[in-house]
Amino acid sequence: MVFPFNKENKNLIENSDLSQFIISNVLDVRISKKVTTKVSSKENRQINWKIEDIELLDWNEDFDTFILGNIRELSEKMNFNYFVSIAKKCLEHNKNLVVYDNENIIDFKQAFLEKGLYLYTPYLDLGEYDETNGEMWHISKPVVCIAGTSSKQGKFTLQLNLRRELRELGIKVSHISTEPNGELLGCDYVHPDGLGSDNLGEISKKILFLNSIINDFSRYNDLIMIGVQSNSIPYSFGNINSFPLVQSNLMLSAKPDVHILCVNCFDSETYIERTIKTLENQYESKVLCLVVFPLSMCIDKNTGEYHEKRLSVYEMSIIIEKFEKRFGIPVFENGENDSKLVNELISFFS
């Protein structure tokens, strides 16, 4: 069971071919207006689900695990604690529970253990960390980082697509994700830094711990892929919340050889240039290419509200040509020409 149908779970469903389990049902609240909508796997459109109302779920159905996505905003909107309600239902009906948020799980962990059930959430446990007096491992295998200029650019989907393409070529890829559903989609390790994550520990210990994890994976793989969320450099310096501190931790721990930079079609060229220069200078890396997300923000003339608009093929070609001329590196549309992007990677490391 998967609930609700939000960004993270949409990604999980569309890339279900990468999972080691079968999704039986997809659920949401009726007020979302998504109930009865059909959703499908991206790789096989014949595998699909009709979104069902969670209030009508029969907990006696034959499923063993409930996947609960980020529900903080939904709980506030509905004035209802979905985590507590679903955790109690799982205990009552002997179901395992996977939770993307790391909130209040301590109140239920013992109860799940006593019933032989698991309650899982991704988090960074520095208890596994061995002190190294500050020494960093040199990662001997190529490290590729998918970075961006903002949130909501399809960075995780791009990582999954690249990993799929590389593995089809026989390249062993170790994938470290910052998305809470990463392990469900075959990632080797999850370092959550998005909504609802709880990253504890001193910055130096965190960097050393992640560096050790990445070094371990490099021993058995041909290439390391990491992805960071949201922006890679500050939008401004007026508020600490705009500082990409968690992103920097992961990039410092991996020291990427190459960055693939996701950008928006409406990003200023100055901001993109600042990002490229920072990534290349701070991490001694190479920004190999840009990947443009094909959605633009438009203002509704009647309501004055912003809404997303997908750019036409012609509009995208103009933007791609402009960025290629301005920055002198290849530019791709997100979701298109992934094989060409992989060829760029292989050529760089050859």
Where are the regions a protein language model picked out?
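N-terminal phosphate/diphosphate-binding loop that engages ATP/GTP or pyrophosphate donors
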Residues: V143, N161-I203, H307
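Flexible, glycine/proline-enriched loop segments at strand-loop-helix junctions
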Residues: V99, I146-Q153, S197-G201
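Structural motif
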Residues: T65-G69, C145, L223-M225, I260-C262
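Conserved catalytic-core segment of NTP-binding enzymes
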Residues: V99-E114, Y120, L126, I207-L210, ...
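Conserved nucleotide-sensing/catalytic segment adjacent to the nucleotide-binding pocket
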Residues: L185-I233
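Walker A (P-loop) phosphate-binding motif
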Residues: Y129-I176
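Long, basic/Gly/Ser/Thr-rich N-terminal segments
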Residues: M1-Y118, E284, V292-S312, E321-F332, ...
